[in-house]
Amino acid sequence: STGISFQPQNSKLSYKKGDYMIDTTRSVFNFAPNIDFRYRFSKVSQLRFNYRGRTGQPSMENLLPIVDNSNPLNIRVGNPGLKPSFTHSMRLFYNTYNAELQRGIMTHASFSATQNSISNSTEYDDQTGARTTTPKNINGNWSAFGMFGFNTALKNKKYTINSFTNVNYQNNVAFLYNQDTKVDDKNKTTGLTLSERLNGAYRNDWFEFG
């Protein structure tokens, strides 16, 4: 199945500083497509794929061309050129089971990436020590996850083994001010997590252990 939804969003902002005043309203429609695919190989084996898209709007404070210098050492400037972010999320599932062998397999994989994320760009004034921060769009934020599960019976089906393996990877980007070049560099942070859970059990007509 496939579908597309448009989600209306209404925002209002009132800003006043001295004689300067802004009173504005924003109305947008957020685009949110989705795809859901399922295929059944048999009664005990199936595949499923899911896709979701999500739009994220910049805040009104970030969009308006306002210079907030109420703190002279921490100045914030809005950015009217900010684009909405859009996140792609995909998930894949597969499972199968053999009743005769009492053996099952489960897999799950997912991936998510965001276009036009918002990160703060910061500039420093060496003479005054002031810091000016402006929100800007940035690309490169994504993550991936994978899981493999396996369980089976052994030796007259009195023993069972269960295994779950997980892997998770994160790739995050942000602006980082370079003191030497006086410009922002794209800073990347990555993280990898691996985990394994293995257990066994024994069962007979009298008791179960594990």
Which residue stretches match the model-derived regions?
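Exposed, low-structure sequence patches enriched in small/polar residues
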Residues: 1-210
